[in-house]
Design a protein with these regions (language model features):
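Hydrophobic helical h-region of N-terminal Sec-dependent signal peptides
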Residues: 29-35
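C-terminal motif of bacterial Sec signal peptides marking the signal peptidase cleavage site
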Residues: 36-40
């Protein structure tokens, strides 16, 4: 009788252990599924969509050239203003939009012309913009973005003015070539970006697409300050050259140079920009930076 009870006890113990193991497996599987459903899990627990420290080397810049950046209580970008000689634009960020077709909504208002538009941004698993609907009145333009394994933007397709495709080529973490092609008028622009013999590390994560990298980002440029357009280049650009070609065979070449002033941490304080078109005099401007430290 005692032997039978011992045998029953052992069998019961085995059954209980099996159940515990199965429950542990289920818990682990559920945890993994939860991890897959998050934008970032395990590798960077501090990742927050809209937080500029995702790209700006753990700083929250206040001023980057003609852009001023403002933050909410969670450290996310809430407002970006762009001001130049033509006026100001304001971009407002909503990370919990009522719209069900996007993860982030950016509302942009242009003060001088009383124009308003909305960017409905859908993110990929890394928290970068993948699909965007740009809505202005009854018009909808589409954007699509692709990134390399390092999280850097390599392709942009936009429907504005016909299908416009921008292809970006990198060398050692830096944008080396940009080709923009439009199916609407068969025009194209081919640009090369140089980083000089003495390269300057891009410690601030500066990526001024239109101004320095020959990428026609337009309204989507605001999204970069919230970390929504991928990782920055490894170094700061020191010059670029763009050759634009029309369907009629007309070509125009543009040159730009960038002279950087750095602080003790090797972050930009200012940059002197000189631009030259063929057979024209040069124009210059100075951009300043405030890293909010």
């Amino acid at each position: 009788m005692r032997m039978q009870l011992k045998e029953i006890h052992n069998k019961t113990k085995v059954v209980i252990m099996d159940r515990v193991k199965k429950q542990n497996v289920i818990v682990i599987l559920l945890a993994l599924l939860a991890c897959v459903g998050m934008v970032s899990c395990g590798d960077d627990e501090s990742f927050i969509v809209g937080k500029p420290s995702n790209i700006f080397s753990n700083v929250s810049p206040k001023i980057v050239g003609k852009y001023s950046i403002y933050y909410d209580e969670k450290g996310r970008v809430s407002l970006v203003t762009e001001c130049d000689e033509y006026g100001c634009r304001k971009a407002f960020f909503d990370y919990s939009p009522a719209d069900k077709d996007c993860d982030v909504r950016i509302d942009i208002a242009e003060e001088n012309y009383d124009e308003k538009l909305s960017l409905h941004v859908s993110l990929n698993k890394n928290g970068y913009a993948e699909y965007v609907n740009e809505i202005e009145d009854d018009d909808i333009e589409e954007w699509k973005f692709e990134y390399n394994s390092n999280g850097q933007l390599i392709k942009m397709v936009r429907s504005e003015g016909g299908i416009e495709t921008t292809t970006i080529t990198y060398q050692e973490g830096d944008i080396a070539k940009v080709v923009q092609e439009s199916k609407f008028d068969d025009s194209s622009t081919s640009s090369t970006i140089e980083y000089g013999t003495e390269k300057i590390e891009n410690k601030g994560g500066v990526m001024l697409f239109d101004e320095m990298l020959c990428i026609d980002m337009d309204e989507m440029g605001f999204a970069y300050f919230a970390g929504l357009l991928g990782r920055p280049t490894s170094h700061l650009p020191q010059s670029n050259k763009s050759v634009g070609s029309s369907s009629g065979g007309y070509k125009i070449t543009t040159y730009k140079s960038f002279s950087w002033s750095l602080d003790a941490k090797r972050q930009p304080v200012s940059v002197f920009i000189e631009e030259n078109y063929e057979n024209t005099t040069s124009s210059t401007k100075i951009y300043s930076f405030d890293w909010g430290e």
